[in-house]
């Protein structure tokens, strides 16, 4: 009886959900691409204004860069307006679900259960270190042509090194942050989740 009530409630929730239009889905996908383009253009490409005097052709690239930025901002604004119209703007930004590890047996969860303070300290330190190195790389990229306007193969390889370093450190920051969030839940949370899984499995059998 309880199982049928849960199914009825889930069906009722599904009926209240409004199906997404094709235009909304297309704008959502374009918004993700536009975000990547804007982030790369803003943070990973150094300001090219100091090169205008020595390299006049840079002005054309700056115009193209401005067009891409405007298109990205337009797509981003359109996506936000669609979220407001759909009523999911706050849910999209402020109601993010907490990540939890779904593995029945996990070495990281066991490490957190036995040494919770050390687990949180280690992952917090890794997050802080990767974040600081990533920000330092972004600062070096931002000042790359401001301090020296030389453009040659060695300088471009140096720029590529800082760009790669920034990407890797930010990826590692997100990786360790996800591990810190998903594996640092209290032990009773996992016990409750496993109990719910086993009880639901028993009902199905």
Curated annotation (Swiss-Prot):
One Pfam family named in its UniProt record: DUF4668
Keywords attached to this entry: Membrane, Transmembrane, Transmembrane helix
Membrane-spanning parts: 64-84, 125-145
Cytoplasmic-side segments: 1-63, 146-205
Protein's membrane topology: Multi-pass membrane protein
Locations listed in the record: Membrane
GO cellular component terms given for this protein: endoplasmic reticulum; fungal-type vacuole; fungal-type vacuole lumen; membrane; peroxisome
Extracellular topological segments: 85-124
Protein's name according to its UniProt entry: Uncharacterized membrane protein YIL089W
Species assigned in the record: Saccharomyces cerevisiae (strain ATCC 204508 / S288c)
């Amino acid at each position: 009886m309880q199982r049928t009530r849960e199914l009825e409630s889930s069906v009722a929730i599904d009926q209240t959900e409004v199906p997404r239009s094709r235009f909304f889905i297309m704008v959502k996908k374009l918004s993700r691409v536009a975000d990547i383009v804007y982030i790369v253009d803003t943070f990973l490409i150094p300001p090219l204004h100091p090169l205008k005097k020595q390299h006049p052709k840079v002005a054309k690239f700056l115009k193209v860069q401005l067009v891409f930025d405007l298109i990205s901002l337009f797509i981003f604004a359109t996506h936000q307006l669609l979220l407001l119209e759909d009523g999911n703007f706050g849910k999209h930004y402020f109601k993010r679900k907490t990540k939890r590890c779904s593995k029945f047996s996990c070495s990281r969860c066991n490490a957190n259960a036995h040494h919770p303070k050390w687990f949180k300290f280690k992952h917090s330190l890794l997050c802080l270190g990767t974040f600081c190195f990533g920000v330092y790389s972004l600062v070096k990229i931002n000042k790359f042509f401001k301090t020296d306007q030389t453009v040659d193969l060695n300088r471009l390889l140096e720029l590529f090194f800082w760009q790669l370093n920034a990407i890797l450190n930010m990826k590692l920051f997100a990786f360790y942050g996800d591990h810190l969030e998903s594996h640092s839940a209290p032990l009773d949370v996992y016990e409750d989740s496993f109990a719910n899984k086993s009880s639901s499995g028993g009902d199905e059998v």
